[in-house]
Amino acid sequence: RISAIATPQGEGGIGVIRISGEHALKTAGKVFEAKNGKPLVLAGSHHAVYGHIVDEKGQVVDEALALVMLAPHSYTVEDVVELQCHGGLMTLRKTLELTWKAGARPAERGEFTKRAFLNGRLDLSEAQAVMDIIQARTETSLAMAAGHLTGHFSKGIHAMRHEILGMIAHIEAAIDFPEDEVDDVLTYDIQKNVVEIRNRIAGLLQTAHAGRILRDGLLTAIIGKPNVGKSSLLNSLLREERAIVTDVPGTTRDSIEEYADVGGIPLRIIDTAGIRATDDVVERIGVEKARSYVKEAALILALFDASRPLDAEDEEILKLVRGRDAILLLNKDDLQPVVTAEMLQRHVKKEVPVITISTRTQDGLEELTKAITAKVYAGTQAGQEGTFVTDARQAEVLRQADEHLAAAIRTIEADMGLDFISIDLRSAWEKLGELTGETVGEDIINEIFSKFCIGK
């Protein structure tokens, strides 16, 4: 049996200690005394019992509720007790230590969810989605994680595996009864079905870019020369006054990093120092950091002042974004414009959007949101996030499964025989099973759950 704090550590109204495994009720009963005097093992499943946490000497540590969930009707499919105390740091630590003295051991990272997976309550994709739900930063990210948790992604994988297994069964039947002479018809049907499954895999792989961004965020650098409105843009995207805004160039000397919800997409925004030549040592460090962030960023928002002619500093910004995924923003369009979007467009490729905005009046921000959304969802359909590929491992497994299916088609075209086709199909079937956890190795399972927090 294992135990851990299941709520964020710190001060709060409620803190939860979770205990799971054989004799979980016995362990909880050693640290919890019910107000009604009845042993906790007599409590019914999904009943909350009021009482107190007590130490070895019978001294009260805190008042608490014990929530009992008996196997198999619990998160882990094991007996589970959740001790709900007050959310003080010392209270939770003391209670946790008492559960260890009572026979539990400290839970490893993600061990509760790992047990739910090993006990068949969740498949691997659904288990991974638990952490994604916890870390979701936008409603769209949450919808994607919830879709995985409720099996929308897995359903498609199970369907493909079922169809592949059906093809394998037909091949094996044809091998066992060769007198039927259906090889040509069978291989034609198999090739047609394999092509259809490969198309589905290709569709899933198209979602990998958007899925990764919705899960991890899009690293976005805001760059421009000093006093062009970078901090004002950050504040507008965050909908709060996060960065200091003044008319003094060089106010932002270091980089500011924040997450913003832009059209449901989590942007990990870095507001950089204004890029210019400077003798100020501190500002120069900030400028160098800004240049390094430009290299790392997946998206660059480059700001230019519409009310002033382009100068050498603006030319430097244009050089930095050349060949990068960027959106050019012409700020201060509420003032008398000197630079137009058409003038700025001449300096970059046609596919680089140029948007006129005003961080003072918020004009153009909706168009910016649409441009970012279009970049993220390119080739995919918004509203289907529950079936998106969400991480690099899933994408790689799908690519490898597709390679096995492509090999099956080559085998058919080379007329190499049913045995060889079956080998390729079975390899694809096993590879797809790694997504749901049905054919995955223990090392991969351990790696996935090691990224979870303790208590989940």
Annotate the PLM regions.
Residues 1-5, 9, 51, 139-261, ...:
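C-terminal-of-GTPase-core extension/linker across diverse P-loop GTPases
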Residues 19, 85-87, 237, 272, ...:
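Glycine-rich, N-terminal phosphate-binding loop of Rossmann-like dinucleotide-binding domains
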Residues 50-62, 66-70, 250-278, 296-299, ...:
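Switch I (G2) and immediately adjacent beta-strands of P-loop GTPase domains
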Residues 105, 266-268, 353:
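Conserved beta-strand segments of alpha/beta enzyme cores
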Residues 98, 293-296, 316-317, 371:
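Alpha-helical scaffold elements adjacent to nucleotide-binding pockets in ATP/GTP-utilizing enzyme cores
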Residues 249, 275, 283-287:
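Short alpha-helix of the ABC ATPase nucleotide-binding domain corresponding to the H-loop/switch region
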Residues 283-307:
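Inter-motif core of Ras-like GTPase G domains
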Residues 1-143, 147, 151, 327:
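A glycine-rich (often HGG/GG-containing) alpha/beta subdomain
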